[in-house]
Amino acid sequence: STAGDTHLGGEDF
């Protein structure tokens, strides 16, 4: 994931 991961599971969305 990227430095902007703030979603569930820490995935990129």
Curated annotation (Swiss-Prot):
Keyword ATP-binding: yes
Subcellular location: Nucleus matrix
Chief localisation class: nucleus
One Gene Ontology term, aspect cellular component: nuclear matrix
Domain of life, per lineage: Eukaryota
Keywords: ATP-binding, Chaperone, Nucleotide-binding, Nucleus, Stress response
One MF annotation (Gene Ontology) recorded for this entry: ATP binding
Known role: Chaperone.
Protein family according to the UniProt entry: Belongs to the heat shock protein 70 family.
Entry protein name: Heat shock cognate 71 kDa protein 2
Species in which this protein is naturally found: Rattus norvegicus
